[in-house]
């Protein structure tokens, strides 16, 4: 065979999957060489992997199951790389979660796993993972209904992260187990998208769940908007383009976000926006499939959600319109302190725009805030409808995705531990490290409600 791409000469764990592309001398024969740990290398065609994955479809999350398709004029090398990553991600998932399946072991040429209960852990935690005691707890940087977010430092690497700690008891009482597991699933499949927060570790003990995430200390978009009252069109366009890219990516993965608001958009130290908090995401939303759960934040709810009608991905485009409106004018459209009055306005009141904005901006907001979802911008071609709108004509989308554009505003950030852009309401909350990393509880805990929650970031590759 001919050339090999991405050949990594490094130490690997016994259950770590590596995969390389091998292209024949005729440039047509392509196989994918897969190896688990330091075991034997197996070479199979893409079709062989795809056939097997199809037989094991029930074991594979829908968010990663769809095979990559070649785009028009896409280079072969990029297409092979996307296929390689797809094979790698699914293989690692099967090895981590389904080794008790005889078919999986046979396909990957693996021996039967040890049945000793003392050696069983949750999913990917069979690998070397993090624990609560691996971190120093520095500052509180956020809080929610189920827990708080902390700035933490990994004791060994000294790297700064954001750690979200949730109470299992509160999650169960509120019947939110599915939402938390959906958040975990979305996070592990973000593939380091430039505008989606990345998960580095997740783990648990008897009482708590832990998400270890990118630390973004440029502040919430909400706090910057509150301080400045409103943004210019050009600055709003930059942020709206990033949000649209993130939503479009999630939609490609058949995920509806459902909770877009300025509080869930964080700035990094370069001035780029990153979407966070995936607790209300809905998975497995292929094509025009609908759902009907009433959820979201009142100011940004689409009419069909308020009316408890079936809704689809276009609710996210309504939210984008609401956030863009708020960036331009300072408040969400149809805003009222009285929620019932606001809901009535969202459903019945015509959209009114001031005349101090450009025609393309006015047309975009109007298109996104169509009360009839079948007429809403994004209904036909999803992200492409938004990307191709005249308002975004000045945006170089490739440079934006590669983070090569200069942000219109760069927050003042001294270093990774700087909390000057974080609300004092959070920073002043005292931390009790002993309650966050209790010594008396098992590091890992068999808990069927949160089975397969544990994760460690090892082979995250941008596709």
Swiss-Prot record:
What GO terms in the biological process aspect are recorded for it? intracellular signal transduction; lipid metabolic process; mesendoderm development; nematode larval development; positive regulation of vitellogenesis; regulation of gene expression; regulation of protein localization to basolateral plasma membrane
Q: In which tissues is it expressed?
A: Expressed in late embryos just before hatching. At postembryonic stages, expressed in sensory and motor neurons and in the intestine. Highly expressed in the intestine and head and tail neurons.
Give the positions the UniProt entry annotates as the active site. 259 (proton acceptor)
Q: One GO CC annotation, please?
A: nucleus
Indicate whether Ribosomal protein appears among the record's keywords.
no
**Binding, ATP:** 141-149, 164
Q: Could you say which EC number(s) this protein's record lists?
A: 2.7.11.1
Q: Which residues form the AGC-kinase C-terminal domain?
A: 393-463
Q: Which reaction does it catalyse?
A: L-seryl-[protein] + ATP = O-phospho-L-seryl-[protein] + ADP + H(+); L-threonyl-[protein] + ATP = O-phospho-L-threonyl-[protein] + ADP + H(+)
Q: How is its activity regulated?
A: Phosphorylated and activated by pdk-1.
Subunit details: Interacts with pdk-1, akt-1, akt-2 and daf-16. Part of a complex containing sgk-1, akt-1 and akt-2. Interacts with let-92 phosphatase regulatory subunit pptr-1.
Recorded protein name is: Serine/threonine-protein kinase sgk-1
To which species is this protein native? Caenorhabditis elegans
Q: Which gene encodes it?
A: sgk-1
